[in-house]
Amino acid sequence: MNPIAEFVKENRKAAGLTQEQFSLRSSLGLRFVRELEQGKETVRMDKVNVALAMFNAQTVARKKENK
């Protein structure tokens, strides 16, 4: 699973929120929340940052690790 999707889903559940409640509190659409948690690859970063801000988190750019 996508690490951002996993983070949002785990923290939403830990906060005791349904997807609908999270959607309302964050002012994000329910469809977006569902797609984000399902790991959709093409989501708007501004909305991702709104979702992460609900848990006092943000996206950070870093170089990929060589495998």
Model regions: which residues?
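A short, Lys/Arg-rich alpha-helix, primarily the initiator
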Residues: 1-13
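Residues that mark the N-terminal boundary/hinge immediately upstream of a DNA-recognition element
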Residues: 7, 18, 44-47
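Conserved amphipathic alpha-helical interaction elements at protein-protein interfaces in regulatory
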Residues: 10, 14, 54-57
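Surface-exposed charge patches
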Residues: 10, 20-21, 50
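Short alpha-helical DNA-recognition segment
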Residues: 17-34
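Short, charged recognition helix plus adjacent turn
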Residues: 41-42, 60-67
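DNA major-groove recognition helix of helix-turn-helix/homeodomain DNA-binding modules
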Residues: 46-62
